[in-house]
C-alpha cells in the first residue's frame, strides 16, 4: 500500500481549512435570481464569478422554497471554487421586493424620525407593515423606502446560515443596479429611461435627478415589438406631461446586445435623446470551465458593480 501523504489525512485537511478561514477573509458577492445563484470573489487581485442553477421551483416569486437544498448549493459552489473564509453580501432577487419614494422627505434633512413619520402614513404597496421589513435610504435628493416580507428576508438569511457563512450585508438587485446606473450616468443632465427584463415582461423605470419616479411593467408574451414600443412611448409621454418636463431622455437598456436593437426605435434623436449604455470597466472572469451555462446578464453585472462602488 502506498504511504498516505499528510495532505490526504482528513484531520490535516480540516486544520488547513480552519487556518485558511482565520488567515484570509474573502468578500463574496452573492446575487440570487429566480433561476440561479451567482457568486463573485477576488483572487490574486482579479475578480471571478461562478453560477449554479437552482433546482426546479426552488425559488418562487423571490421566496426560497427549498432552503436546505439551496444552502447546500451555495456551500458546494464556494467549496468547489476553493473559496474559504467567505463573508457574504447578498443581493435579493427582483421579485418579492418593493420600493417607493417617500413624500416630503429630502436627503438633506434625512433622519430616522422623518423617515419613520413618512412610513407611518402608509405606502402604496402590497406589504403589511406588521409583517414586513422596510429600510429607508437617501437617493440623490430624495429618500427611497425598500420593503420585503419578513418571512422572505428570514428565508434568505436561513439559506446563508445553514451554509455556515457570515452574512455581512443584504441589498436588492434593482435598487443596487439603479444606484450604479446613477453613478455611471452622472454627467447626463436629462432624464433617464431604464429598461430591463422582469421574467417574461419588460420593466421601465423613469428617473429624474437620480430619483426613480416611475416603475412600470409591460407584458411581452404575444405582443408585437411595435405595440410594445408604442405602450412604452405612451408611458414616457404621460410622465413628461404630468411633470411638465420635456427634457432629452438618456436610455439605458439592460438587455443582451441582440435584444437592445428591439428598443432602439424608442430613442428620438430629434429630441436629443441618446443611448447611455457604455462598456463596463469591471468584468469578472468566469471561474473554470463550468462557471455556468450563461454569461452574466447586463442587469446582474450592473447590480454587482453597484455592490462594489460606494455611491454618495
What are the residue ranges of the model-derived segments?
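Hydrophobic/aromatic-enriched cytosolic interaction surfaces used to assemble or bind macromolecules
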Residues: 1-312
Amino acid at each position: 500500500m502506498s504511504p498516505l501523504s499528510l495532505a490526504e489525512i482528513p484531520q490535516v485537511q480540516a486544520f488547513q481549512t480552519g487556518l485558511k478561514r482565520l488567515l484570509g477573509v474573502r468578500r463574496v458577492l452573492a446575487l440570487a435570481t429566480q433561476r440561479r445563484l451567482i457568486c463573485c470573489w477576488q483572487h490574486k487581485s482579479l475578480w471571478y464569478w461562478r453560477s449554479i442553477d437552482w433546482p426546479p421551483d426552488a425559488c418562487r416569486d423571490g421566496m426560497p422554497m427549498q432552503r436546505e437544498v439551496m444552502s447546500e448549493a451555495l456551500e458546494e459552489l464556494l467549496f468547489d471554487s476553493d473559496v474559504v473564509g467567505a463573508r457574504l453580501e447578498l443581493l435579493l432577487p427582483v421579485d418579492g421586493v418593493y420600493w417607493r419614494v417617500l413624500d416630503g422627505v429630502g436627503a438633506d434633512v434625512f433622519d430616522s424620525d422623518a423617515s419613520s413619520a413618512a412610513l407611518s402614513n402608509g405606502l402604496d404597496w402590497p406589504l403589511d407593515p406588521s409583517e414586513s421589513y422596510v429600510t429607508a435610504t437617501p437617493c440623490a435628493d430624495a429618500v427611497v423606502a425598500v420593503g420585503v416580507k419578513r418571512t422572505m428576508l428570514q428565508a434568505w438569511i436561513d439559506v446563508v446560515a445553514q451554509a455556515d457563512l457570515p452574512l455581512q450585508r443584504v441589498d436588492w438587485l434593482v435598487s443596487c443596479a439603479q444606484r450604479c446606473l446613477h453613478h455611471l450616468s452622472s454627467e447626463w443632465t436629462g432624464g433617464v429611461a431604464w429598461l430591463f427584463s422582469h421574467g417574461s415582461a419588460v420593466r421601465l423605470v423613469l428617473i429624474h435627478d437620480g430619483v426613480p419616479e416611475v416603475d412600470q411593467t409591460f407584458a411581452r408574451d404575444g405582443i408585437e415589438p411595435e405595440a410594445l414600443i408604442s405602450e412604452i412611448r405612451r408611458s414616457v409621454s404621460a410622465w413628461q406631461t404630468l411633470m411638465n418636463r420635456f427634457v432629452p431622455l438618456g436610455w439605458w437598456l439592460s438587455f443582451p446586445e441582440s435584444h437592445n436593437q428591439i428598443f432602439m426605435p424608442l430613442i428620438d434623436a430629434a429630441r436629443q435623446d441618446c443611448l447611455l449604455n457604455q462598456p463596463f470597466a469591471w468584468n469578472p472572469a468566469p471561474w473554470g470551465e463550468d462557471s455556468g451555462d450563461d454569461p452574466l446578464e447586463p442587469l446582474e453585472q450592473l447590480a454587482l458593480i453597484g455592490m462594489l462602488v460606494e455611491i454618495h
